[in-house]
């Protein structure tokens, strides 16, 4: 990293930061957010939920263990830009395959280091997330010539669009089934550093080797969701985000997983309508043939889309929840869990439908972190129980999903 290679960060409110260029050179625009994770930057960079965003790492030193491809959450990086206080140039880790700087260049990610990330984080916390632009390389001369006003107009007009379509794990084919995978005993150890499922928090009492069939709707699914299901013996069919309700039901899965993903959940009206149809079908089955009902589990964006399909509302948070240290309380037991989170929207917990019960609440701001639906076999959480590079406190929710599927199968 050349200390003389300048980079600028310009925010929509006119705030200006000068630092050192990292990664690729050029200019990039996105929604500027911050994450409080001390580790897990590989997972952050490859998490599709960060699509369209410039990510600020609040921890002052990033990159000290390098890049490990086995820890990727998807096939590539999705961030629009990357901001760190200090980038480690000499990583040390027996699993390290490249430096963070090398990865950023290979992925074409434009970044900036050496700025006061604490001041930037305070600004975003007090004013809310805002659009920004990172400028480096040859673009510096053009910026100096034109002045910031021209760029501010572009920055303010930026909006994340077509997010779900952009982050598909594989090519979308009009709602066609993309992939079906079963359990590979070597698959779990490959992606968990050789740890056994129990060492990652799997409930020993949870049903195992049941070969449950789970339809995973890919809204930008993190790889660890599929890994957690597969290591519990599930056969996973990965489906495009726009798969029709009738196509999903024709697969006769034991369970439906609604994945994480980027963007404003309320904009996905077509997807919400398909999930609504599945829930209505489930509701009818519960009246006449409850053994045919399908268990549903939603995570993050999946939690929000399920809530919208059931009549709840969502709203944008001032600066979101991003990082691996967010405390949530389970409503029934009062127990507190530390969770990994990455979202800018939340389900409004006022005026929830009568059949929706809040199961978890955020202890920092009181927002809804989970819902249980009493009229159909469905539940969802706002946080990430599958988190790697984060806490495993709520990993048991995957076991709860298996138990829900087993309860449905026991009555057949």
Where are the model-predicted features located?
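Cysteine-nucleophile active-site neighborhood
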Residues: 260-349, 388-406
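Residue-level detector of beta-strand face positions
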Residues: 8-9, 327-329, 370
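Proline-centered loop/turn at the N-terminus of a beta-strand
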Residues: 110, 213, 295-297, 313, ...
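Active-site-proximal beta-strand elements of phosphoester/diester hydrolases
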Residues: 213-218, 339-340, 379-383
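N-terminal Rossmann-like NAD(P) cofactor-binding module of classical short-chain dehydrogenase/reductase
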Residues: 257
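RNA-binding accessory domains that recognize and position tRNA/RNA substrates
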Residues: 2-182, 187, 191, 198, ...
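Catalytic beta-strand/loop cores that center a nucleophilic Ser/Cys/Thr
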Residues: 335-376, 412
């Amino acid at each position: 990293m050349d200390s003389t290679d300048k980079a600028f960060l310009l925010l929509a409110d006119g705030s200006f930061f000068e630092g050192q260029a990292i990664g690729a050179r050029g200019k990039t625009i996105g929604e500027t957010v911050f994450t409080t994770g001390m580790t897990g930057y590989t997972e952050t960079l490859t998490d599709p939920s960060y699509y369209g965003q410039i990510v600020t790492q609040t921890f002052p030193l990033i990159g000290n263990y390098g890049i490990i491809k086995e820890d990727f959450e998807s096939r590539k990086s999705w961030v629009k830009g990357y901001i760190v206080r200090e980038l480690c140039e000499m990583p040390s880790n027996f699993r390290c395959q490249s430096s963070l700087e090398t990865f950023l260049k290979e992925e074409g990610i434009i970044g900036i280091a050496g700025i006061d990330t604490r001041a930037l984080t305070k600004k975003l916390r007090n004013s809310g997330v805002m659009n920004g632009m990172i400028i480096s390389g040859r673009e510096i001369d053009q910026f100096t010539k034109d002045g910031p006003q021209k760029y501010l107009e572009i920055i303010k007009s930026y909006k994340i669009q077509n997010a779900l379509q952009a982050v598909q794990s594989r090519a979308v084919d009009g709602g066609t089934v993309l992939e079906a995978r079963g359990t590979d005993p070597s698959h779990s150890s490959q992606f968990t550093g050789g740890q056994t499922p129990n060492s990652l928090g799997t409930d020993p009492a949870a049903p195992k080797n049941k070969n449950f069939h789970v339809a995973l709707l890919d809204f930008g699914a993190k790889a660890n969701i599929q890994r957690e299901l597969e290591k519990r013996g599930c056969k996973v069919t990965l489906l495009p985000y726009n798969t029709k309700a009738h196509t999903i039901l024709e697969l006769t899965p034991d369970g439906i997983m609604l994945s994480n993903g980027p963007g404003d959940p309320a904009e996905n009206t077509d997807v919400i309508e398909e999930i609504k149809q599945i829930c209505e079908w489930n509701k009818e089955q519960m009246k006449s043939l409850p053994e045919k009902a399908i268990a549903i589990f939603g995570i993050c964006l999946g939690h929000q889309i399920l809530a919208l399909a059931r009549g709840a509302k969502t709203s944008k948070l001032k600066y979101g929840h991003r990082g691996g240290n967010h405390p949530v309380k389970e409503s029934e037991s009062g127990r507190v869990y530390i969770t990994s989170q990455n979202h800018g929207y939340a389900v409004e917990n006022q005026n929830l439908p009568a059949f929706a019960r809040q199961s978890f609440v955020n202890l920092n701001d009181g927002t809804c972190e989970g819902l249980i639906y009493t009229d159909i076999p469905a539940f969802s959480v706002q946080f990430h129980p599958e988190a790697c590079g984060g806490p495993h406190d709520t990993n048991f929710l995957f076991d709860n999903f298996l138990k829900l599927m087993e309860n449905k199968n026991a009555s057949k």
